[in-house]
Amino acid sequence: MQDLKIKCVADSKCMLGEGPVWDEINQDLYWVDILGNKIFRYDLSSKTVDWWETPEHVGFIVLKKGGGLIAGLRTGLHQLELQSNNKVSGRRIDRVDENTDHIRFNDGICDSRGRIWGCTMDMNQEAPLGKYYKYNGELSRTEVDKGYVVANGPALSPDGNYLYTVETVGGAALNKGIYISELKDGATVKGKQLFINWNKHSKSTFPDGIISDAEGNLWIGEFGGNVLRCFS
């Protein structure tokens, strides 16, 4: 693997910046400020940054075919349109906060089949209330995993046969670390195992966002360490 150099392209001063999404067609980079309730977009050609306020904490966004975004907000999955006044408009598609004020979407991705995989967390970071959900192309929800205090990711292997999930803080149910599960027929999760025990790697930092590259390497943002880790 060649040496990589990291540089700042947009000093957006986020409270909790996460979830980069690349728009290949328009050559734009999107990301969210979860606690700042904002969506950002960086235009590669003009090197300018635009932003939009969201009505709730925004855990992740994915690009919607035909325009607009699907976003995991605090109370659930929303369809959003970006407006010219730094605001968003839209509607809630699905509610996942279970009628509590301390559950929210924390992270999520769209896979090559157009399915959305999203996860929730306990905002108090105490109880194993976090879950992983899968939405099909019609945005019908299926619960695929549970028992996380702070869930992150997930990531899928390049062949789509394995799902990687993250327990960021750890608790009575799950150790802090990365978990791997088999995806039967690319859909049904089974056989979850601890893949990377983070406490053996670091007791003072936390595994956060995760992605798998074309070679099957796992890239993990290390919260509290200001480091991007690659596991192969």
Task: Label the predicted regions.
Residues 5-11, 47-53, 91-98, 139-146, ...:
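A short beta-strand motif characteristic of beta-propeller blades
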Residues 186-232:
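Glycine/small-residue-rich hydrophobic helix-like segments
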Residues 12-26, 55-72, 98-115, 146-165, ...:
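Beta-rich, blade/repeat-based domains predominating
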Residues 87-144:
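Hydrophobic alpha-helical segments and helix pairs
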Residues 44, 82-85, 133-139, 227-232:
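Flexible "stalk/tail and boundary" regions
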Residues 38-40, 76-78, 130-133, 177-179, ...:
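A short loop-to-beta-strand structural motif that recurs across blades of beta-propeller domains
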Residues 80-86, 180-188:
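Short loop/turn segments immediately following beta-strands, especially the blade-tip
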Residues 24, 29-34, 70-75, 116-126, ...:
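Conserved beta-strand positions in repeat-built beta-propeller and related beta-rich domains
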